[in-house]
Amino acid sequence: MPSFDIVSEIDMHEVRNAVENAQRELTSRWDFRNVNASFELNEKSESIKIASESDFQVNQLVDIMREKLAKRGIDGAALNIPDDMLHSGKTYSVDATLKQGIDTPTAKKIVKLIKDSKLKVQAQIQGEQVRVTGKARDDLQSVMALVRGAELGQPFQFTNFRD
């Protein structure tokens, strides 16, 4: 029976490249001259600290970071940015976390979405991924389109496609 896995993974090497590119752009932009602004990647906690002297500049830096991630093939929805900014001294900062892996509530939403579609496939949660099996390859491709079109707040990849 054909099957595939729905996963949510981020290549940390590409994230590191995107952070370095964003830092490089930051040094060359005239509106950030003589401004204490930075991007810091923490690979262990999978987060990016974005800091600057004003909240408006932090929002600009977030846009730069999303643009650089998109150029490196990482969906901007993978970057989770909190609404509140940390303010200490004369610096505003934000700790943006990278969403990786499918948590249980999201996996349950995916399974429910697939079951509600009435396609002849089975979906089962396996840790941080969802395995979908079915008799027809066309049904599996319909499930892929369904999951891509669903707004679940996280980018998904489809791996391990077997016939």
Curated annotation (Swiss-Prot):
Query: Is this entry keyworded Iron?
Result: no
Q: Does the keyword Lyase apply?
A: no
Q: State any GO CC term.
A: cytosol
Q: What are the cysteine partners in each disulfide bond?
A: none
Query: What is the top-level taxon of the source organism?
Result: Bacteria
Which InterPro entries does this chain map to?
A: DUF520 (IPR007551), UPF0234-like_C (IPR035571), UPF0234_N (IPR035570), YajQ-like_sf (IPR036183)
Q: Name one Pfam family in it.
A: DUF520
Keywords (alphabetical) are: Nucleotide-binding
Molecular function (Gene Ontology), one example: nucleotide binding
Purpose:
Nucleotide-binding protein.
The UniProt entry, under PANTHER family, shows: UPF0234 PROTEIN YAJQ
By sequence similarity, the record places it as follows:
Belongs to the YajQ family.
Known NCBIfam families for this protein? Answer: PRK05412.1
Q: What is this protein called?
A: Nucleotide-binding protein plu3881
Which organism is the protein's source?
Photorhabdus laumondii subsp. laumondii (strain DSM 15139 / CIP 105565 / TT01)
